[in-house]
Amino acid sequence: MTKMIKKTTWFALALLLTASCRRQDEAAADSHVVRCAVIGGMTMTGLWQQIGKMFEADTGYHIEVVATGPRPVLDAAMRAGKVDLLTMHSGDITTDLVADGYGINMRPWTRNELCIVGPPDDPAHIRGMTNGAAALRKIAAAKAHFVDFEGIGSRELVHTLWRLAGAEPKGDWVLRDDTVSKFNILQFARTNDAYVVVGYIPAQSGLMPATGMEILVQGDPIMRRPFIVMETNPQKISGVNSAGAKALSDYLLSPKVQSFLLEFGRWPKGPGPIFFPIPAAQP
């Protein structure tokens, strides 16, 4: 009986895998379907779903989100030939996709914003500031605890802010990030009564639990990170819907979507906006 159950289970799994592969093959062959890999923040907030509805209504294409989540997941999906288009934060991963021949026509199309989160008693008195560098300068002057977060995007931007602040994050007031998961960084900061720079979306949405912490500084254009869009290279991957990917990529940079970003960009739990247009966006 046990052997029969195992055989039945494996047979069922094989059928599921076969069906899944068949659906992917059919999608790849369907010129009306655009398979996408989308960074998690866009699907979590509903931005991508709204843009998808607009695109489908205006063009007749159908968007299929094949992969969503952190950047490594999207990177793997493009390299495996599962998607026609990818959108995520710019960085080494996206540059490597282009350098390795998987991605083409990489263009920025929107930005999100980072913020400074800290304890409610705000020992450095930065609450309400809209200049990140000036806020860090005050944190350094007060020698208030500050977490050197290891998050890829945050770390790059914070280095820029410290340079603009004309201060160095050195001393026992600078705490090393030793969290196992980046989503625990606000809890770590709370435990140490410290400030930290993180993305506004995960902080405001609860993706990074922030009990006992407050968003104190936001609204600085310098604290914004670009998202790029790129199409899969048909010379590297077969079965790519290049026409559909190009149409969607151009659509993201269209005046209609760029205007919509600010209309959409109000987080239900906070003042927003969440996403920002690219001033020079042109298809």
Briefly describe each language-model feature range.
Residues 2-10:
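Bacterial N-terminal signal peptides that target proteins for export
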Residues 85-111:
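Acidic, polar ligand-binding/catalytic clefts
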